[in-house]
Amino acid sequence: MWGQNAGFKDCKKLKKVVFPNHADLGILPNFALGCTALSKIEIDNWQYKMQDGVLYYYNTNSWAAQYYCEGYTATRWNVAEYCTAINCEESLKNNAHIHQLRLNSYVSCPAGYKLPESLQAIYVAEDNKQYFSKDGVLYYGPNTNNPNRLFCYPADKPAVTYTIPENAVFDMGSVKNKHLKTLVIPKSATVYDSTLKYICRGTVFPNLETIKVQKGSPHVDYIRTTFTGKVIVY
């Protein structure tokens, strides 16, 4: 028996899916999409398990998060310690309740544009070598191929002021945040040209009012001549 991608689609009243016990199952990632009331899956199969609204799949070598119930109302997802991959990107993005995501020691995070718009913070286990989190904002780890580079600024992070970490590389990508009003840029931080342009034009932070940039930063002149809000050189 196969659960194909989007086998259940836009079933707005669907609340529970029950799979036959001990059946020969193949449940593909995101088998139910647009099912925003689905909060429970019943399954008794050695290759699958449910934990905290997430269906995990065992491929005989490792466990992966295969489906995130779109109607599961918990505001925090702690990725199971045994999970090595997140395959449920579409169903996760469709969940409007999750505010916090905590990555375990070794799992990779979906790209920022694939994360829920309701997300306010991302945290990581202390021994995770891929990433570090600064005030709920996710960066690549210092010993990776993209050291200290921004991975994701959560779309619904409620902070009105954010200070980029020292020596960080700030690259927003396509994620937008409407809450930020003041951005602080230390001179040791690098802001990608494209990101700086979008910041100054109000594309990524549409309600940004003030940029505080440290004296000695290579971005001072561009910010002064481009940003129409308040510029403070400190």
Could you describe each region identified by the protein language model?
Residues 5-8, 31-32, 91-92, 174, ...:
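Periodic small-residue-enriched repeat registers in elongated scaffold domains
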Residues 87-88, 172:
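Short internal loop-to-helix segment that lines adenine-nucleotide cofactor pockets
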Residues 55-67, 138-139:
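Extracellular disulfide-stabilized recognition modules
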Residues 111, 194, 221:
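Alpha-helical elements of the RecA-like P-loop NTPase motor core of helicases
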Residues 1, 9-26, 35-53, 68-85, ...:
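Structural signature of tandem-repeat unit edges
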Residues 60-64, 143-148, 203-204:
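Short, solvent-exposed loop/turn segments that connect beta-strands within catalytic domains
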